């Protein structure tokens, strides 16, 4: 119940953060920031 939902939310948030970090890193590498 609660614990599983918290875990899902955490995974979702972590995924979003990781994605934006990767996007930022790749735009820095390609010099398009």
From Swiss-Prot:
Where is this chain's protein located in or outside the cell?
Secreted
Judging by the UniProt lineage, the source's domain of life is Eukaryota
Quick one: signal sequence residues? Answer: none
Record GO biological process: defense response to bacterium
What's one Pfam family here?
Answer: Antimicrobial_2
Keyword terms, alphabetized = Amphibian defense peptide, Antibiotic, Antimicrobial, Disulfide bond, Secreted
Cellular component (GO) terms are: extracellular region
Disulfide cross-links: 27-33
Question: Any keyword Secreted?
Answer: yes
- InterPro entries, from UniProt? Antimicrobial_frog_2
The question of whether Disulfide bond is a record keyword is answered with yes
**So which tissues is this one expressed in?**
Expressed by the skin glands.
Q: What does this protein do?
A: Antimicrobial peptide active against E.coli (MIC=5 uM), K.pneumoniae (MIC=10 uM), B.cereus (MIC=7 uM) and S.aureus (MIC=12 uM). Has very little hemolytic activity.
Q: What family does the database annotate?
A: Belongs to the frog skin active peptide (FSAP) family. Brevinin subfamily.
Question: What name appears for this protein in its UniProt entry?
Answer: Cyanophlyctin-beta
The protein's organism comes out as Euphlyctis cyanophlyctis (Skittering frog)
